[in-house]
Amino acid sequence: VADNDAVMYNLAAGLFAQGLWETAYMVDLMGGQRRSVFTLPGAGDLYVTSMGGRNQRMGRYLGLGVPFSRAKAEYMADVTVEGAQLAQAIGPTVEQMVAEGKIDAASVPLMLTMIDIVCHDAPVEFPWDAFFAGNVA
């Protein structure tokens, strides 16, 4: 919120755009159709997921500085948080693929940050300077 009480969405917009950027990278890497990134399967789903529901609720706790494991245990113990489950499911594989050079870390800083937050209880600190710098043509 700005000094004049206006709600500011610049950070959310940056995260949303970076999410699409990284999705395009991963779709290209896996031989998918980039069109899906910018239509309902990509942008549409990301918008709905990020603007409400359980993922958004977890994001609020994380944004308040509550570590993922504590937020899950204390506030959402019996709730399925799909984004977190996905990060836990793919996190180790993504980290291994980055270590093996199969995924370019510079192209997915947001994904790696989210994996770190969910899988390793890292604090929420986004690498803003690394955004929009990866290999997306």
Model-assigned labels for residue ranges:
Residues 3-7, 17-24, 28-137:
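NAD(P)-dependent Rossmann-like dehydrogenase/reductase catalytic/cofactor-binding core
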Residues 11-15:
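Short, contiguous, pocket-lining structural segments
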